[in-house]
């Protein structure tokens, strides 16, 4: 064979284009309406976006300040997008968050295109709708964390792989590698979680010889390395004295950050780079890296359940059933190829998220959403096509029953929020299951089943979009769902008096403060550059004491600020009083006078 069996592209019904338009416009409305409600979102990344609108070098490296002392602890791809928007439209909450919302619309559109080519427009529309209506998707596509662009690039990679599967195209497979490589530049090794699924689907179903499949996959691996490696190489070759310190690394290296703090450290529990380890237990509930105990049930816990698990049971049931029913199909069967791609995406990502022992946030599961959405849509559509037989109807009924039962449990966790929703879901779900089992397989039954399956999840999604989200660990769903959630890095209470003081400065940095989570509030509220001593948590050795002393001697920093920490440990909120940042603070306290400005202790570094 020279092509995957019968790509579903011919004879598209007239209703499809209007339906796609409704899907994309509805997604845009959901993600863009009042998008600025969250203000600066995660102040840490907002500070870097702001710096990128001031200085191109800061934009390229993802620096926290235009003086390029230290970067964020992630690669800068998402900051590039938000920074360009800020340069075009002016830096604001709106200009920063709109690119993330558009990434969401693009992800839904690309998922539709990918599923349509192998499974037809009905499955494709359903997959797009399921992704759009996943609560954690609405959360992250309206927020400024890197995850929005990660999902866009991963779904783009899935689309390119589907195109490669159709006729064993090397070009499309190389583009798959490029998409994953750029995903690395957004969130490092998390982008590689889909690689097992991509390799499996292509190795099994590509319509060409085994030898050609192998060398094509090796070429695609090369594309990953090149598209990810150019920026890594640029940073490595850039003179160290002329670039910012790579936050989170132990030796100022992007590769060490990728395989250390942002790689194996996330899997096995290593905490942080720099010269002082953050003390996560200083945040109540953060003893297990913000994600609770690792284990097979993690994705169904109070912390994770409401994010992306709504359809996970149905996806697993549909995947197993779909693979069983297609077991005798030709190697290049399109349905099995699609299930291998999206199903393996779901299973591998779910297992990794479940067993990570390091830092993990519930919103990471947004990377699961495309796999779950596509797997459910494809398996449900194929089972519906076989509804004349008992076995497919039984599997559909089980998928629906599992979804309704799990939705009821999730909604019951917020008993005071719209209780009518969970009971409506239960009633409609029971009716749908009964109708499927007795063989009343009409379109009205399909509609009933879809409403029952999606009503609870969609309600959570609407609640998510209507609520402001701030800090480093945002959560989806109604406000009551967040009780007990661990968060940090949210907006600091604005010190109006201090902001006015900083606005009068003309130095390179208006002020310096330990830890980006505190310094970001000063920079964003005053509109002036602020040096985040020690990077994200105050634990990075940047600047060194000698460098800081040179900045002060050169008149580059006007003030050093020590704000109240609300009982959260040392400067920066992660015990940043140790290490290099602690030495800098001690030196300032010994050599400069302090005054109190709006409750903050402020040292004037121009007076000694």
Where on the chain are the PLM-derived regions?
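Short periplasmic/luminal acceptor-recognition loop of GT-C membrane glycosyltransferases, typified by
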Residues: 455-460, 464-538, 553-588, 592-606
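Transmembrane helical bundles and short interhelical boundary loops of multi-pass, membrane-embedded
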Residues: 387-492
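Extracytoplasmic/secreted proteins, especially bacterial periplasmic and envelope-associated proteins
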Residues: 44, 48, 76, 80, ...
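Alpha-helical scaffolding within the catalytic cores
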Residues: 242, 250, 542-552
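Short low-complexity, flexible loop/linker segments enriched in glycine and/or proline
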Residues: 207-208, 546-549, 576
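Membrane-integral, polyisoprenol-dependent glycosyltransferases
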Residues: 1-394, 402-406, 463-465, 536-537
